[in-house]
A protein has these predicted regions:
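Short, mixed charged/polar active-site loops
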Residues: 20, 115-117, 155-160
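Envelope-exposed proteins and targeting segments
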Residues: 19, 97, 102-104, 124-126, ...
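Alpha-helical transmembrane spans
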Residues: 30-96
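Short, charged cytosolic
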Residues: 1-25
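Flexible glycine-/small-residue-rich
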Residues: 25-27, 103, 110, 124, ...
């Protein structure tokens, strides 16, 4: 596991002064790239259909004008180009992708030309799950997904994911434990709480391992 000492310097731009980083990880390259394979397969199948269509269009039996046929095929085969471009994007983004667990929130860092950050406060997390597929299991990694209420226009859930990280079950338990502690502090900030944790005004203390 990574610590503050080897944390990418760019995380300092969004970390609060009183915020501690408890875990930082990076996605496994193979698993990260595999996230783009479904879109790539669809694009290649679409491209294969367009290639077959193009061979018929440009054969001697066809009278289709080139000024119409070429732009049409280029536009129609967009899913193929987008699938390939997405794989290139994932390759370039991987080196700039890191995940962090802090005393206040989850942090996700990525970006190609620039650096993008996304944070998820613990009180917003409604559901979490950890997935370890066959490929991930063979690489000793897994993916943690957190749902914070965001949905698509059709009502599908939008997850924030820690993709292909090492020790996924340990990190999952760590996030769940911190989330329960922080939510309890926010929901019941009063002096009647145990002396070791009188309210959210206190600083979250990392338990000794």
């Amino acid at each position: 596991m990574r610590t503050d000492l080897n944390l990418p310097a760019q995380f300092g731009a969004v970390k609060d002064d009183d915020e501690q980083l408890l875990w930082v990880g990076k996605p496994n390259f193979t698993v990260f790239m595999l996230t783009g394979v479904p879109f790539l397969i669809i694009g290649l199948l679409w491209g294969a259909f367009d290639f077959f269509f193009a061979t018929k269009m440009f054969s001697g039996d066809s009278n289709a004008p080139l000024f119409f046929a070429v732009p049409f095929l280029l536009l129609h085969s967009a899913p193929c180009w987008l699938g390939i471009a997405n794989m290139v994007r994932l390759f370039l983004v991987h080196g700039n992708t890191f995940y962090a667990v802090t005393t206040k929130r989850l942090m996700l860092r990525s970006g190609f030309w620039g650096t993008d950050f996304k944070t998820v406060d613990y009180d917003k997390i409604a559901d979490m799950e950890v997935n370890v597929g066959p490929v991930e299991n063979s690489l000793c990694v897994g993916t943690i997904r957190a749902f914070s209420g965001n949905t698509t226009s059709k009502g599908g859930r939008i997850y924030d994911s820690f993709i292909g990280i090492q020790q996924p079950y340990e990190v999952f338990k760590k996030i769940k434990g911190i989330s329960v502690d922080v939510k309890t502090d926010w929901n019941y900030p009063n002096a009647i709480r145990p002396e070791t944790n009188p309210g959210y005004g206190t600083k979250y203390e990392k338990k000794a391992e």
